[in-house]
Amino acid sequence: MPKKAASPEIKAASFETSLSELEQIVTRLESGELPLEDALNEFERGVQLARQGQQTLLQAEQRVQILLSDDVDAPLKPFTPDTE
């Protein structure tokens, strides 16, 4: 079965919008109140959003590495987020 291309709505949505929608999907799925078919549709949409988000993050990481590599004095280091 060939892979489906990401739907246009996902591509047009910002990362933040997609993340918000994904959080809402998780909440609905965790409630356990959706009929099976609706839950499967929500799950499918969630997987699409998660994959798109992963791709967006990968592209952002690559852009940062490219920007840092333009400065020969800036060593590449693994990104570690601030923990508060």
UniProtKB/Swiss-Prot annotation:
SUPFAM superfamilies cross-referenced by the UniProt entry: XseB-like
UniProt main location, coarse: cytoplasm
Gene Ontology molecular function terms on file: exodeoxyribonuclease VII activity
Localization: Cytoplasm
Reaction equations catalysed: Exonucleolytic cleavage in either 5'- to 3'- or 3'- to 5'-direction to yield nucleoside 5'-phosphates
E.C. number: 3.1.11.6
GO biological process, one term: DNA catabolic process
One Gene Ontology cellular component: cytosol
InterPro entries from the UniProt entry: Exonuc_VII_S (IPR003761), Exonuc_VII_ssu_sf (IPR037004)
Keywords, comma-separated and alphabetical: Cytoplasm, Exonuclease, Hydrolase, Nuclease
SUBUNIT field: Heterooligomer composed of large and small subunits.
Family named by the database record: Belongs to the XseB family.
Annotated function: Bidirectionally degrades single-stranded DNA into large acid-insoluble oligonucleotides, which are then degraded further into small acid-soluble oligonucleotides.
Protein name per its UniProtKB record: Exodeoxyribonuclease 7 small subunit
Name of encoding gene: xseB
